[in-house]
Structures are given as structure tokens and as C-alpha cells.
Design a protein with these regions (language model features):
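Globin-like tetrapyrrole-binding proteins
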Residues: 1-178
Length: 178
């Protein structure tokens, strides 16, 4: 990981390249999930409503369930951005999300899916940087590096929570609510 956590300019660039606009958030979340489903179609099985849509010949990406899931994912990213000046608050929050994903192992969630989620975040966030014409080329490239590190940070702590959860370990037994 780069040194963005200790660099005020990088933190400012991170916030500058983030938007809480509903449509932008939905588009980002959709891009993340569509990337995941294209890379690992079996991940669709984690969401029972997808097979229902597909059996009916409907596009699951147009359904309310997909929209809600896409927004749920980007809310986590948004929470990280809002707390970028207080990173110590985030570890338990992300770890807890990983712990909760243990319940999806019965639906086919596998530890290697975390890597696909990380790749999807990195790809979608990198593509999003191209929608910022106000950034210099250097700032755009730096933002891509910072967002890559954010994706790594998020997944690293979620994966740790998930792996510990599989072993019955919880380093943060009091649920972190932020």
C-alpha cells in the first residue's frame, strides 16, 4: 500500500473524487456487481433472487433487489471515505462485515470471492477516475493508486473477519456500529 493514510493531500484527493450522488453511487455499485458476475458467474448463486429473475426471462440488474445490493456495497465504501481521517474506527466495522459473510458460505461464498470483489472495486473505481476531467493526469493516476489501496484496505479487513469467523474467532465481539 502507498502512503496515502499519512498524506493530507492524498486524503483530500480521495474525498474530491468521491460523490454521494445517488445515481453515481448506484452506477458504481452496479459496475462492481456486474464485473463480479461477469468474472465469476457462480457468484450469482449468492443472491437467490437472481435465479428467479433469470427464470422469468427478466434482467436482474433492473430489479429492486439488485439496486439495494449495489447501494449497500457502495455505502460501505462511502463510510470508509467519510472516516478516512479516523482509520482506526474502520477496522472493526469492516471486520464485522466479513464476520457476517460467514452465513453466506452455505450459499457458496468462498474465501477466494474476496479477491474478485477487490478486483471489481479496483476496476470500477479506476474507471470512475476517468469521469473527472478537472483532474490533472498526475492527480488522476494518483487517485487510481489511492482507490486501489482503499479497495485493498476494505477487503483485507473483511477477509480477516470472514476467515476468523470460519474458525469461530471474533476479535471485535462487541458489534461496531458507525
Amino acid at each position: 500500500m502507498s502512503d496515502w493514510k499519512n498524506n493530507p493531500r492524498d486524503k483530500s484527493l480521495l474525498r474530491q473524487t468521491w460523490s454521494d450522488d445517488f445515481e453515481q453511487l448506484y452506477t458504481l455499485g452496479s459496475d462492481i456487481y456486474l464485473y463480479i458476475f461477469n468474472q465469476v458467474p457462480a457468484c450469482k448463486g449468492l443472491f437467490p433472487w437472481i435465479s428467479k429473475y433469470e427464470a422469468e426471462g427478466r434482467n436482474f440488474a433492473e430489479g429492486a433487489e439488485f439496486r439495494a445490493q449495489a447501494l449497500r456495497f457502495v455505502q460501505t465504501i462511502s463510510h470508509v471515505v467519510k472516516n478516512v481521517y479516523h482509520m482506526e474506527r474502520l477496522e472493526g466495522f469492516l471486520y464485522d462485515i466479513g464476520q457476517r459473510h460467514v452465513q453466506y458460505a452455505s450459499r457458496g461464498f468462498k474465501p477466494e470471492h474476496w479477491d474478485v470483489f477487490q478486483d471489481a472495486m479496483q476496476a470500477a473505481l479506476s474507471n470512475r477516475m476517468n469521469t473527472h476531467p478537472e483532474l490533472s493526469m498526475d492527480d488522476r493516476q494518483r487517485a487510481i493508486v489511492i482507490w486501489r489501496d482503499i479497495a485493498l484496505y476494505i477487503i483485507l479487513h473483511m477477509k480477516e473477519g470472514y476467515n476468523d469467523g470460519l474458525k469461530g474467532i471474533n476479535r471485535f465481539p462487541v458489534r461496531v456500529i458507525m
